Amino acid sequence: MIALSTLIILAALAAIPLVWWTPRGRGIDAVAWLGLAVLLLISPPSAGWMAAATVLAPLGMRLADRLRRREAFAALWTLVLLSAFVAAQLTPGMIWIGGAFFTLRQIHVIGDWWMGKLTPPSVAANLRYQLFLPALFVGPVHRIQNFERQCTRRRWDREQFFSGAERVLLGLFSAEVIGTAVLTQSRVGLRDLLKGANPFLQDWALAACDWIALFFTFAGMSAIALGLAAMMGIRLEENFNQPWRARNLLDFW
């Protein structure tokens, strides 16, 4: 597990008592501000862009509604988001944290608003949705409507809390033990075993090992995010539930 993801997980664990000790209705807001602080510590450019885009999007949507320019703003803002994401990826040495998932969440909000499924969220609602710490690094790309309902209905639930903690532990085992330790050593052994074999077979076998490691790492990190959210009283949508059974891209994701 890379150091950056470990830092974010530790910060999210520290946020769990914060979310329950903060006065009612403000716990998730506190988690979002902590998420912004962690981003600022790791990657000031990421923090600056995400904070600015999160504040500007609802204001732009309201202005576009008043001017009756919804389609134009949706197209322009989507272009800005995608351009910023591509520019960040092409900038040498830049640490870009959670950029892909942030961009997808922003596009989801803009898309649902453009199609009339969503009224412009408040700046506060958009901040807590976009900067929710457990989902900041590896998703899932949950819907803002469901997230706001979860925030409103959030209550202490002992069973949900410990179920979330169990899922965090299972996710850590999947990502750290299986995805990193076991499969890294297996790859070394497989490479030694295939010395002298057909080059295509070597490349295929090692690539398969890498993909299996990626599966366990990403599945584990997703489980950690969902478990941490559950410990905060939030149930996020599943985004990695038996992907091998998917019949299309929507089922896969």
What is each model feature region?
Residues 1-252:
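Membrane-embedded transmembrane alpha-helical bundles that form the catalytic cores
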